[in-house]
A protein has these predicted regions:
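A contiguous, surface-oriented mixed alpha/beta subdomain in the mid-to-C-terminal portion of proteins
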Residues: 1-61, 65-74, 85-87, 102-324
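Short, cationic low-complexity segments
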Residues: 90-99
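A glycine-rich, hydrophobic loop/mini-helix early in the fold
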Residues: 77-91
């Protein structure tokens, strides 16, 4: 989004709060990922409404669907509640499990309007600040809660409002907890509709590049094992520190492998400056930056003993003044 006013991290996360595992009411909508359901017969019986972009074709792979709870009977809602709870239990063991139920949404519109809005946000065209196309168009699965959770702290409020459109409340799982994004419509009337190019919603290339690191950020957060009681704001702050470290690993230290980026980001998040500025490592950072050597991150990590890591261990609540 071009021309919007930048906000701080604390401002971007203020609309999100922890939520209990949702108990399904008789109204509202579920956003589901049909491809994540092992058995589709029960899901098909609910007649989910596919969010299909214009001229998409017949292959629905990767697309979300809407379930209107007002059209579900008590037995169907019970089945959906069982799915939600089973997925939650699975996430307690494996935090990055692909979810079938992506969100519960309140929206003052009918299912067709909501599905149409989400469909219009799925096709993205990254553009340079000059307005020129930077990359080919792509399908953006922003509705996946593993992605959406990070967008809540990455995106400016106007961009997030554009994404969720008519939704006034968006409840989603992330890692081992559930969260809700409230008050999304507060500024909706002030947000201009996104510019579209040939059926694609345009997105700034810098934002798009950041979203491409979300999977690596999530892997690092899962490895850190953040306490479930840690407030959303602290989890988002940790995610932002991880993003900064992943970017540094990729751009400054020239590590292109995900394992290197995750290892580096994990150690920065755990140990901060004690790891980054350790006398046995500082020369290696310079050599990696200038491409004089090509050590992997795991090789550099092994240069320090377990006792040393224990000595400068920090709580996993890092604060980084450079975080946007």
């Amino acid at each position: 989004m071009i021309g919007q006013t930048a906000t701080t991290l604390s401002q971007r996360v203020e609309r999100v709060s922890v939520s209990p595992v949702p108990l399904l009411p008789e109204t509202g909508y579920l956003i589901v990922d049909p491809g994540a359901f092992a058995e589709s017969d029960e899901l098909d019986s609910l007649r989910p409404l596919m969010c299909r972009p214009t001229n998409w074709g017949r292959d629905f792979t990767g697309l979300p669907a809407i379930i209107d709870l007002a059209h579900c009977d008590a037995g169907q809602r019970d089945w959906l509640a069982i799915v939600i709870n089973a997925e939650h239990e699975s996430r307690l063991r494996m935090q990055l499990t692909r979810p079938g139920v992506c969100a519960y949404v309140d929206a003052p519109v009918d299912a067709n309007t909501l599905a149409g809005h989400l469909a219009n946000q799925l096709l993205i065209l990254p553009v340079e600040k000059s307005g020129h196309r930077a990359l080919p168009g792509a399908l953006w699965r922003f509705f996946d809660p593993r992605v959406f959770a990070n967008l809540c702290w990455m995106l400016e409020p106007e961009h997030l409002t554009t994404l969720v459109g008519p939704a006034s409340r968006w409840v989603f799982p992330w890692l081992d907890s559930w969260y809700e994004c409230n008050g999304i419509l507060d500024t909706a009337s002030d947000v201009a509709p996104p510019e579209r190019i040939g059926g694609f919603a345009r997105i700034d290339i810098d934002i798009w590049d950041r979203t491409q690191r979300i999977a690596t950020i999530n892997q690092t957060l899962a490895r850190l094992g953040l306490p479930s009681e840690l407030p959303w704001q602290d989890k988002a702050a940790t995610a932002a520190v991880v993003e900064s470290a992943v970017t540094e690993a990729e751009r400054r230290l020239h590590w292109k492998q995900t394992d290197d980026q995750v290892n580096y980001a994990e150690h920065i998040a755990r140990y901060g400056a004690a790891f980054r500025n350790h006398p046995r490592l500082v020369d290696h950072w310079v050599k990696l930056e200038t491409r004089v050597e090509t050590f992997s991150c795991s090789e550099l990590i092994a240069l320090l003993s377990q006792e040393e890591y224990e000595e400068f261990a920090q709580p996993t609540r890092p604060r980084d003044p450079t975080v946007r």
